[in-house]
Swiss-Prot record:
Chain positions covered by the region annotation Terpene cyclase: 1-342
Motif window: NSE/DTE: 238-246
GO biological process, one term: mycotoxin biosynthetic process
Known function: Bifunctional sesterterpene synthase that possesses both prenyl transferase and terpene cyclase activity, converting isopentenyl diphosphate and dimethylallyl diphosphate into geranylfarnesyl diphosphate (GFPP) and further converting GFPP into sesterbrasiliatriene.
Annotated segments matching region Prenyltransferase: 343-732
Protein name: Sesterbrasiliatriene synthase PbSS
Gene: PbSS
Motif (DDXXD 1): 105-109
Positions that bind isopentenyl diphosphate: 453, 456, 485, 502
Organism expressing this protein natively: Penicillium brasilianum
Span(s) of short sequence motif DDXXD 2: 492-496
Pfam families listed in its UniProt record: polyprenyl_synt, Terpene_syn_C_2
Amino acid sequence: MDFLSGAFHYSDSVNPSKYSPRPSDYFGTLPFRTSRFEREAADVTADYLRKWQKAVKADNPERKDLVFHGSTTTLGHFVSWAYPECIPDRVDLCTQICDFGFYWDDVTDSVNVQENAEITQDLALALLSELTLGQRLEPKLEINKIVVQMLWGVLDKDRKSGLEMIKFWKGHLDGQAESAHNNMSFEEYTKHRLSEVGARWAVEVGCWSLGINLSREKKDSVAHFVNKGLLAAALMNDYYSFNKEFDEHQRAGSMDRLQNGLGILMREYGYTETEARSILREEIRKGERAIMDGYIAWRESADSSSESHELNRYIVMIILMIGGITFWSSHASRYHRDDLITTAGDRAMIVGKFQCSMRLLDGYPPPNRWKSATSSNDISGRKRKSWSDSNGVDTHGACYTNGSSNRAKRNGTEAGHKANGHDSMDIYTAPFLKAPSEVCEAPYEYINSLQGKNMRNKFMDALNHWLCVPAPSMQIIKNIVQMLHNSSLMLDDIEDESPLRRGQPVAHTFYGISQTINSANFVYVKSVKETSRLKNPICMEIFTDELSNLHTGQSLDLYWRYHGRCPSINEYIMMVDNKTGGLFRLMLRLMEAESPAASSASLVKLLTLTGRYYQIRDDYLNLTSVEYTSKKGFCEDLDEGKFSLPLLHLLNHTRHPDRITAPLFNRASGARSLAREVKVHIIQAMDEAGTFEYAQGVLKYLHEEIMRTLDEVEADLGRNTEARILLLGLGL
């Protein structure tokens, strides 16, 4: 690490072997340093803990048994190792941020789901009021009052970096609230893990603490190797926290919410805890090697500009952060506990929980206890999703009983199809046999597996605070909306010739256009059957009405593109209300039909405005957001020739509309994408025409109207904190 010399001002290099005793469970390979302000951080932690304990007691006088495990260890302090180059006048707040993260988890992990939601909503409402409306509201709970005072200090010190940090923290909380990893492969888990773990939040804490100011685009330019290191940090957290997390979820009866790679390897793949830990250590080392190799390669190609210098600080900060947190985690009392009630024997109970569908982990042998059973199937020579055990689990996850395949039994006795070595004629007069739906549903299952923001379900839950729809009906409505949404995405991707959906290849890339269309139609049929299960007979009429609106709205969009006809703003809004707003109205009307409670006329307006906001924001971000580029491609709406609101504004405010429409609608035969240079020209033209400022103004106006309409609904139906948080969050 000699190439890092001279880059530090507030820390000293450290050799792990100098600590006595050296943590026996430490296996990190990345370097770390120690801050010269460790004593100050330790004093802040002691003071913050006293305040936090007092606040917890004030919020819940009955709670006496909660123990908090924060930053301080017998060998040092979390901040000293994680952020050794923290600017001295930010050490106080940086320490509070870190301890808050630990103590917040301790509190929320100790309460039930309802109490957790109340605590989170109380804090979220105060944060979003500041971030979107510029209003500083005081939370109800004492612990949240401590938190917001700390966060106001963060914003007052460095608002730009502070906002990024707070946004990532909120995303981390959202990810935790939504997560459940039952029946998930390790590969799928690792893809989700970065968005759920605090690693990205920890990076933004580091940027604020060190005063690093970089655009999202610059950060993303090194994400291809930085993310491998962050994934290693996430898995490292899983490695050290597993015993603690298992114990907490076992006590709470919430094992389905256990977010841990060790749990996945044990439950889904049948590995023992020892085997799973060995695999996780190897995956962590791979990630650590990858970030170091990536950094060295980047250094060799980087120039000497100030931007490269700042980016270098950013990468080095992350490397040292991962190295320091690994050392801290290897011995911190937060993870190495003597008060757990569960044992290794209890943890072993989840090994191979789903015996009939064990998975095979790429790059690793099956569990030792299955090697003898799998050797005869030559697993090592072929790639399979699962492996055979001696109790009759086939290599594709189907169960066997007494040596016979259930799949064969469903399809009839194979021996009956043969007579004297020839095909039997009986097959031609056999009874009707219903075809399995797996093949038909495969494209839908793929698109459904891609991680989205789940905003529609959140919105329905918020609406149900007012409408009180019975749980069975509510689940059916959620199923209907989910099926219609995802099937429409499959068709949209075909009609738009899109290459990506949520950052992954579109469904028809794997299944073909014809099969994907067939799957979408099949899901439409399933949604009709779901609607028939609702109690109010008017629900079917509502369903067909809004499904018709969805298609007529989409037809306008497709017609304008195909014929190169620029719509008016009024026509555009009509299209949005039918195409995008259709699902919002469908969910509301079905909920109202199944609800025993009174509704409000303003609810329809609220959802109509929300649908418009979503579409216009999507139009805007498609052309301006780095995140959208990574998930959909660079300015994909221009490739589609889509008449988005920014394009409408440009065509009405440029002196040379022909220079815009010509490349959009007069392409060479078979050319799907515009040349990057053409896209850049159009974006520059939008900049000059004030298009993006116009779109921002429309969104600001719509958001104000949404909040005003929410006030009207709350006047009719009562306060709804969940809905207010969701709608405030739109303005971020």
